[in-house]
From Swiss-Prot:
Catalytic residues (UniProt): 185 (proton acceptor), 189 (lowers pka of active site tyr)
Keywords carried by this UniProt record: NADP, Oxidoreductase
Keyword Glycosyltransferase carried by entry: no
Protein source organism: Aspergillus calidoustus
Protein name: Short-chain dehydrogenase/reductase drtF
Amino acid sequence: MAPALPFALPSLAGKVYLVTGGNTGVGFHTVDELAKHGARVYMGARSPGKAEAAIKTIRAETPTADVHFLQMDLMDLHSVVAAAKSFKEKETKLHGLVNNAGIMATPYALSGDGFEAQWQTNYLSHWVLTWHLLDVLVRTLQAEGGAAGSVRVVDVTSDGHNFAPKVGIDFKDINLEKAGVFARYGQSKVGNILHAKQLNKLYGPSGSETAKKGIWTAAVHPGHLDTNLNKQTAFPKFVNTLLRAVGAYSPPRDGAFNSVFAVASPEFKVADSGEYFVPGQKKKQPSKVARDMELAGRLWKWTEEELRKRELLD
């Protein structure tokens, strides 16, 4: 049996959650912990086979686990929109969204939508997913009587956001074709933090009444983990082997702690909404650009405009 969580987590019976990238690594353990506590959890993933295998593993330990596969391909924005619509056909409530899926330091590649792979997978697809789920998130908050912390959105980011370009988000060259793999990764992770902060500003507990305040948000760094994410990187395999040998990586389950804490624990308070968390459920200031609210607003506007051009927000 796994050790107890390092924070309080009550029964989540009657609550519904969606976790992207839920079939592996941090996402898998996030789904597992929520399901163990009685929640209904949707596992967002691209591969039906891998998702069903992951669900089978969860149910082997927790036979009553209420976990369901929701197909989505984050490298295809239309697939993400379709996934959001599919979810809303199945459920009328969503208490928590964990934008978890991601890739790290991968070789330069463009999606079919024309965006650099890390930018789209880590940031852009999660923005559009959240956008299309805002209506059900708001309805859930209303159904819960506006109860504090009853609806939350968590963006999984990284301390790798410090590798971003000096400007944070390079709107003049959003795909960063000539930059290094970690600069592109860093930009996407800055995007995650700014998304959580702007979402909190618009829909969070400090927002206006007209913005339907009350959705709590957070950006969380899971830590340096021994997951499949490291296998995707462009640097040599011996680097991962060395880091693993010297104990530089934590177990994937530990990486899920911040996500579960932020999306469901009563120990996460209203003052925590919109903040950046590092391992140990500790708040920390992110980089200067990642806490620039003017940049957060500009990025939100840029993203909305780009997606409207592609008729993805209608």
